């Protein structure tokens, strides 16, 4: 008897087959991006070729690892796992990694980064620095063993041997080269005494030159305070470093020529130019000064010199008058203050003097009362022993002792009995 399967049963059976198939666990596909519309997190699109289409899913974590922008119609190489989605019965690829297809992958990265940096304005002419005419010190960022540095040294020594070359040995190809190039550009800027910088390498494939297309290198060149000459690859090779550099040279020799003057010709031209500029400047200054003298000579002051002092004399008179008024006012004010103070001080001083006079009289009368002659006149006497000691009490004397008695009109000697 024939057994009919439900759609769900068949779909589950096929899903189990897909899940157990080791070949479908990791599939390598090539195709074009179709129906792509960027979403905030996970990405859903399709891969197609001339004969078929397969739905594709890429989770946010994997999508963030891409170093290029997905675009509609882009040919890519995808690696992922095939699975069936039961509710719709459709199969799809869950993409784990994705890169542009073939040599075009780097070309895509190049164009996308160029577009991004152009939008930011990094390649605009207004940012370009002028190369110095006479470079005393030149920084060179390149490989120490290539023909580039030899060509630069030879050219500089031939054209302008006074220039000093400082080499920053740099890896210019392969993994880590971009970091070294950018790092040495920044180190040269930190040193701060270079007039110009040459960066470059010899020719090669797009992969060989790719270090000079990395964003880290482009931004280091843009941020450089030292004018930079780019000399990367052959004349037909173009890198993003060429776009952002202040000048581009087709060869290392051409770069060295841009960095140095042609000693005889350029020095003569420079001297002639400086002479011409100096002459024009002096002529201009003399003209300005002559016009100023002519203008001054026509002024009223030069025609009537005495008028030069009119204003100052008037100002001096006004100041003298003002000083006189201020002095009179000051004296009057001080006199008034003196009179006010004197009016208050004299009555007070009189009272103080009278009080002191009365006090003095009282003290004088008190002293008169204490005068010994006055005391004697009132009938008192001063008794002393033979040693001059004043006798104050009967107990101070003894029988037979001789005493001196001072009276008002003289002294008598008595004996105690």
Swiss-Prot record:
GO terms for cellular component: cytoplasm; exodeoxyribonuclease VII complex. One of its GO terms (molecular function) is nucleic acid binding. It comes from the Bacteria. Its EC number is 3.1.11.6. Keywords: Cytoplasm, Exonuclease, Hydrolase, Nuclease. It is an enzyme of class 3 (hydrolase). It is found in: Cytoplasm. Its main location: cytoplasm. The keyword Membrane does not apply. Transmembrane segments: none annotated. InterPro entries: Exonuc_VII_L, Exonuc_VII_lsu_C, OB-fold_nuc-bd_dom. Bidirectionally degrades single-stranded DNA into large acid-insoluble oligonucleotides, which are then degraded further into small acid-soluble oligonucleotides. This is Exodeoxyribonuclease 7 large subunit. It comes from Lactococcus lactis subsp. lactis (strain IL1403).
